[in-house]
Design a protein with these regions (language model features):
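Active-site-adjacent structural elements that line small-molecule/cofactor binding pockets in enzymes
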Residues: 1-138
Length: 138
C-alpha cells in the first residue's frame, strides 16, 4: 500500500515512546519492503515479477485473494507503491520519498529472494544497492 498511510501510526508510536520516558531521538523507525535492483527498471520488474506472482498467488489462494496480475504488480512499482523494485536511481528516490512520508527512517531492509531469481541476479542486485543506491541515500 501507500507508505504515507502509516504516518499516523508512527506518530502514535513516537508520542507513546516520549510519554513513556524515551528520548524522542531514540525512537527509530525502519522500512521493510520487497525490493530488487537491476540496471534498468524494466529489467528489475521483468526479473522480479515471476517469483513475486508465484508466491503471492499461492498466498492469495489461501486467503481468498484474486490471482496476481502484471498490471497490479506494475501499479505497486509507481511512486507511491510499496514495491522497491527498479533501477538504482528509482529505488534510491523511492527510499527517500518513503522516508520523508514516514517522518524519517533509520533502517531500510529488502526482502529480495524469490523462487524465480537465481543467485547471480541476487548478488548483482546487492552489488547495485551497495554501489549505486546507498551513496544516493546517505
Amino acid at each position: 500500500g501507500e507508505t504515507h498511510r502509516f504516518r499516523p501510526l508512527i506518530d502514535l508510536y513516537k508520542a507513546a515512546g516520549v510519554k513513556a520516558g524515551h528520548p524522542e531521538g531514540s525512537l527509530q523507525v525502519g522500512l521493510h519492503s520487497l525490493g530488487y535492483v537491476a540496471a534498468t527498471s524494466r529489467q528489475a520488474a521483468d526479473e522480479f515479477f515471476p517469483g513475486y506472482a508465484e508466491a503471492f498467488t499461492k498466498v492469495g489462494k489461501e486467503r481468498g485473494w484474486p490471482p496476481v496480475t502484471r498490471a497490479g504488480f506494475d501499479a505497486q512499482l509507481g511512486d507511491k507503491g510499496a514495491l522497491m523494485v527498479g533501477s538504482p536511481d528509482e529505488v534510491a528516490e523511492k527510499i527517500l520519498r518513503h522516508s520523508e512520508a514516514l517522518g524519517g527512517v533509520s533502517r531500510v531492509t529488502f526482502q529480495m529472494d524469490n523462487a524465480a531469481l537465481p543467485q547471480n541476479k541476487l548478488l548483482k542486485s546487492i552489488e547495485l544497492i551497495g554501489e549505486k543506491v546507498l551513496p544516493q541515500i546517505h
